């Protein structure tokens, strides 16, 4: 801390010396002459240590000086003062018993606490002129001794190369910085290793045996540094991505038998099947031989297209395959003819439309009285006559399923059309 003038020992006055203190307060004034400099020794202060507020550039012809806690000069913030004439020390309400004032105006604070951190004001009383005085301010920050950190992990047993993990350095410590070490070295540059904004959390993207650790974190501030114990991730063996093989991706409805197989084969895994994101329920229709690795559907309907997934699991977790969706071939169902009107008058428009559920879409054709008219879903006759009366049939065919179906209706066309004006008696 350097050489100090010995603290006066001739006389000490407690707060009861209020009259003398009041007389000192009369000399307070803004600085007019000397530049007072205050520095802390040591410059970085940790809790429980001592700090000396060392004063430089003291002006000449001094009467005394007063120390305040904070930047407000009043009796409440008054710590202690020194009167040169008589070497008298006076203690104020802010005195804690740990402050020592020296004849060179320096202030020693012992066993500093968090409450001691902050601003201090030194007011110097100059003799010869009661209206002259010099004021200096100083602020110091108190740093806590850093605690021994520990590392917490979002996953203790991540799956190799498959899972992201975040490591956090605990505890969160104010006014401190965080450093990370892997295998005793500072972190390498890698897109798989990313730090949070404060460096307190380390993100590992796809942990491998090369990035499993050991890791250490360090908490550091200007007065101390502490490093954690090594932390190593327990990597689980990588699960292979399963996939589904199937004997027929385009089965015919209620006709073809489907065999699903979950690959790869292993005695170390269990197998689970999923349909539409739900675990496949137990059903007499579904057979699962060979420890559930093979799924057999004796038949399939248009409502069972999927998606299907298989999952392989070990004692720690599982992974699913990409979804597989079937293209179930069906139909054509019984066609529908619209509109279903059967009575028309000569001169009216005949427009019929035919539709049937089918995959792939069916081929359509129209016949009248058994005679082919056209191919397509729609039949249009601009002006019908009585000659157009008869049996209209829509036939549908699906070449993929080999199925056919038809629907017929009878159309009757009466004589000459009656004008609307006559029909309503105009």
From Swiss-Prot:
Residues 1-34 form the signal peptide. Residues 35-144 form the Ig-like V-type domain. Gene3D superfamilies: Immunoglobulins (2.60.40.10). It is found in: Secreted. This is Pregnancy-specific beta-1-glycoprotein 8. PANTHER family: CARCINOEMBRYONIC ANTIGEN-RELATED CELL ADHESION MOLECULE 19, PREGNANCY-SPECIFIC BETA-1-GLYCOPROTEIN 8. GO terms for cellular component: extracellular region. Glycans are attached at residues 61, 104, 111, 199, 268, 303. CDD domains: IgC2_CEACAM5-like, IgI_hCEACAM_2_4_6_like, IgV_CEACAM_D1. It comes from the Eukaryota. SMART domains: IG, IGc2. Residues 147-234, 240-327, 335-410 form the Ig-like C2-type domain. Disulfide bonds join 169-217, 262-310, 354-394. The keyword Hydrolase does not apply.
